[in-house]
Amino acid sequence: MHYIRELLIVVFTSCPALSYAHSSLDGSRYCRCQPGEACWPSLADWQALNSSIQGNLVEVRPIGHVCHEPTYNKAACERVSKLSSNGTWRANQPGAQQEYAWEVSLSRNESCYVGPDNPTEPCSQGRIPRYSAMVETTEQAQKAIMFARERQLRLVIKNTGHDSGGRSSAVDSFQILTQRLKDITFIPEFTPTLGLAEGTYKSKGPSVRIGAGVLTKELYAAADEHGYTVMGGECATVGIAGGYIQGGGVSTALTPMLGLAVDLVQEFEVITAEGRHVIANEFQNQDLFWALRGGGGGTFGLVTSVTMPVFGAMPAVISELTFESQEPGEPFWRAVKEVIYATRDLSTGGNSGQYWIGRGPTGSYFVRLTLFFIGEMDTGKMGGKVGSLLSALQDQEIGFHLNSTAYDRLSSFLAIPQGEFVGGIAFHQENILIPRGFYDSPEGPAELVNRLAEVKLNPGDMWVANALGGKVMANKDSVDNAMHPGWRTAAVLLVGNRIFEPVLEAQRAVQERMTAVEGPLLHSLGPPGPVAIYLNEADADLENWQEWFWGEKYNRLRDIKRKWDPDDLFLVRHGVGSEDWDEEGMCWIQMSIEECPVREPSQCTCPSFGCPMRHVPGLL
């Protein structure tokens, strides 16, 4: 017995700890500081931080608190209710996410929904942070990071709050909001910062440096004004430099031609867990540069800017074909199969496209196919390009509408904000990457249609499929980053979106159905089956997420994470290293001594707030 006690002391003291936060005496967990504990910052501490960042610290309540007693305010509640769908407004609110799902805490049964219907219903903090540093400069962000590090707080980074996995919110957390970092700088001849590298480097041509808080619509508008085309997504209120680009970055219009957004990144500016402001590119901090390109947002540091190339004006014809059906019978699903064939064939020719299969608010089913013909200006040719599809629809006696518009600059189309007022929707997502081999097989498209037909869609639910292939596949041997190798064989990204009523029971039901029923239904497609899952639009309860998101690259990501952030200050749900922590990233889960991430146990580096007690097999 004395031997066991002495051994435990050795195991504990082999991990140098700077200070201890709350700990459980069973030896299984060590936790970050939480409200109500002695280690939680005092009011004076918060005031000192506020002064050091020029008054940009705020105490946070959920945006819906004005709709609930005891803080109910009828006028304020009506105002918040009207603004709730505005994604730009939500991006700027530290007490909001873009999706209701990540404002609530299912584990605690805590919610604070927006709306005047139930003012007597309790309003709880949920996953909304306790405080937010709404930083305006790199220096302010550095001070906020060091405060979180020194005080052992659960830190979250919010860019805009667009995240299907809950990465930008957490229970009892301290938030850094990057929305005020709005710099957009166009650089006629960009040369990466060489650091210690010797010699000179040829210019990479025109580029743009994008601050962490820049929204997609802001970047598109600025690029169009300067005569450039730039890579980005389709939702106007997504932040470019945050999880979008660090998780991969798909562009409906440009990905088949240019690749993933992350494939184009030339340089990052990053604040590390030590509070250092560093540059990561192909010449310096190359391992960090590799990890940031696909390793996920909020994980390796706080990105303050990203630099990527811009392109000249691109003429384009954009065609949209729509049809609907009150009942999704065999003719409807045969028509869907023809849409899949058409998208496959057109993307093979270098064009890009996206199709939606959904159910509208009245209950009818619809399909919307959007195709981008880059370099074209003659709308009269579009009927010929999709002629086989139109003939197939006519054979099925499916009425359709086709509209084509020519743009002398694709950038002028991209600058029209899309999806700006879809904030606050309660929905969950899931997705799969479908390989080219499956799409090209004789049975592939038919099998996919059969699986889609098996899933019951409720009003508001939809499938969205983006064409990949093209440059994404061509970059297999020329681009080395953290993206799952499956992207380099994928033809289509298929995303499922499921709407639910803003009540906890409905949220649980939808999440359970996606994880237990719909996910396995899609994962079993093939052969060849799904090759990967896009972490930015994934099932929040996905199992084996390390393999699905990163595959063989995960171990290298873990090593880089340990080097740059050994204390896991930057931590997100289903992010690199998060398996060592509980669901909320608050407490370190017991690990065996063999898992200590160093060569010798005596050199074990643990979080600065203390080392979790290591389990010694056969003794405990």
Swiss-Prot record:
Signal sequence segment: 1-21
- Please give the biological process terms from Gene Ontology that the record holds: alkaloid metabolic process
Q: How is it used?
A: Notoamides have been shown to exhibit antitumoral activities. Notoamides A-C show moderate cytotoxicity against HeLa and L1210 cells with IC(50) values in the range of 22-52 mg/ml, but the IC(50) value of notoamide D is greater than 100 mg/ml. Moreover, notoamide C induces G2/M-cell cycle arrest at a concentration of 6.3 mg/ml.
Q: Which InterPro entries match?
A: BBE, FAD-bd_PCMH, FAD-bd_PCMH-like_sf, FAD-bd_PCMH_sub2, FAD-linked_Oxidoreductase, Oxid_FAD_bind_N
Q: Which GO terms describe its molecular function?
A: FAD binding; oxidoreductase activity
What are its E.C. numbers? 1.-.-.-
Cofactor(s) needed, names only, are: FAD
Q: What does this protein do?
A: FAD-linked oxidoreductase; part of the gene cluster that mediates the biosynthesis of notoamide, a fungal indole alkaloid that belongs to a family of natural products containing a characteristic bicyclo[2.2.2]diazaoctane core. The first step of notoamide biosynthesis involves coupling of L-proline and L-tryptophan by the bimodular NRPS notE, to produce cyclo-L-tryptophan-L-proline called brevianamide F.
Protein family according to the UniProt entry: Belongs to the oxygen-dependent FAD-linked oxidoreductase family.
Q: Provide the protein name.
A: FAD-linked oxidoreductase notD
Q: What is the lineage of its organism?
A: Eukaryota, Fungi, Dikarya, Ascomycota, Pezizomycotina
